[in-house]
Amino acid sequence: MQIFVKTLTGKTITLEVEPSDTIENVKAKIQDKEGIPPDQQRLIFAGKQLEDGRTLSDYNIQKESTLHLVLRLRGGIIEPSLRQLAQKYNCDKMICRKCYARLHPRAVNCRKKKCGHTNNLRPKKKVK
């Protein structure tokens, strides 16, 4: 039977499979066509992520069904300079003592009307 695999770029891949094929086999066929390693592939059908050991018939995937291919996210270490920039952006803030608005680091007055644009500010507490 024929099924379709739609990638995030919008490209549609056509695969010839059997209902008894496992998800691993489908991922191997995608690797043959697209060169994406199976360990980086995630297949979605009807809002569910498909598990490697199961078959197409387990998920009731029939002829001309469309699977969605997304790539697995990889975690890692942030470069130190980017980490400092992110920390500066997220942590170096001033907080209004009346309305708790987050303001830029050099703020003198609050930008919110509800506290009367008070100048009663404090630095944001640092996370330990």
From Swiss-Prot:
The keyword 4Fe-4S does not apply. GO terms for cellular component: cytoplasm; cytosol; cytosolic large ribosomal subunit; cytosolic ribosome; endocytic vesicle membrane; endoplasmic reticulum membrane; endosome membrane; extracellular exosome. This is Ubiquitin-ribosomal protein eL40 fusion protein. Residues 1-76 form the Ubiquitin-like domain. It comes from Homo sapiens. There is a cross-link at K6, K11, K27, K29, K33, K48, K63 (Glycyl lysine isopeptide (Lys-Gly) (interchain with G-Cter in ubiquitin)). Changing R74G: No effect on ADP-ribosylation. GO terms for biological process: cytoplasmic translation; modification-dependent protein catabolic process; protein modification process; protein ubiquitination; response to insecticide. Changing H68G: Loss of DTX3L-mediated polyubiquitination of histone H3 and H4. The modification (Microbial infection) ADP-ribosylthreonine is found at T66. GO terms for molecular function: protein tag activity; structural constituent of ribosome; ubiquitin protein ligase binding. It holds the Pfam family Ribosomal_L40e. The record marks R54, R72 as: Interacts with activating enzyme. The modification ADP-ribosylglycine is found at G76. Changing G76A: Loss of ADP-ribosylation. Ribosomal protein L40 is part of the 60S ribosomal subunit. Interacts with UBQLN1 (via UBA domain). The modification Phosphoserine is found at S65. The keyword Plastid does not apply.
